[in-house]
């Protein structure tokens, strides 16, 4: 079955576990997230970060990731090149990469409470948010 381009709003990158996607959908039925390996038949797997960020903007997707080291830098490079990215949500170091329940609670809570109404182009948010 083909995915509708507007069906999802969040894209879990290749270093984000499928278990996060499942946990989010368990907590919030029909939560608007898809993993990159299943989005459009996995055709986005292996894209360099800048190309992926630009592709996310074109598809209206916010990238969800753990890569705090390079993704913000790539997002800056995209902007300096005159392009847009679709937005970026990164988990802080305090969030364990294997604690899918905590990740899902942070992501679904933030998205449901406020994130889904935001304009995401060229925005970066770290979860958990600081007050």
Residue ranges of each PLM-predicted region?
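Acidic, PIN/NYN-like endoribonuclease modules and their adjacent C-terminal/linker elements
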Residues: 3-4, 8-14, 18-40, 50, ...
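Acidic, metal-binding active-site segment of PIN/NYN-like and related structure-specific nucleases
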Residues: 49, 56-57, 61-78
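Flexible, charged surface loops at secondary-structure boundaries
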Residues: 2-5, 56-58
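A general structural signal for short secondary-structure boundary/capping elements
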Residues: 55-60, 108-112
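Active-site metal-coordination segments of metallo-dependent hydrolases
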Residues: 45-47
């Amino acid at each position: 079955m083909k995915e509708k381009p507007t069906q999802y709003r969040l894209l879990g990158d290749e270093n984000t576990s499928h278990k996060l996607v499942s946990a989010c959908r368990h907590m919030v039925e029909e939560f608007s997230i898809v993993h990159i390996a299943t989005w459009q038949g996995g055709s986005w797997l292996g894209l360099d970060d800048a190309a992926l960020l630009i592709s996310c903007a074109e598809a209206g997707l916010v990238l969800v990731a753990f890569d705090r080291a390079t993704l913000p830098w790539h997002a800056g490079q995209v902007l300096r090149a005159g392009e847009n990215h679709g937005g970026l949500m990164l988990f802080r170091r305090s969030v364990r990469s294997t604690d899918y329940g905590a990740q899902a609670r942070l992501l679904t809570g933030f998205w449901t409470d406020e994130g889904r109404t935001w304009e995401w182009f060229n925005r970066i948010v770290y979860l958990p948010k600081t007050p």
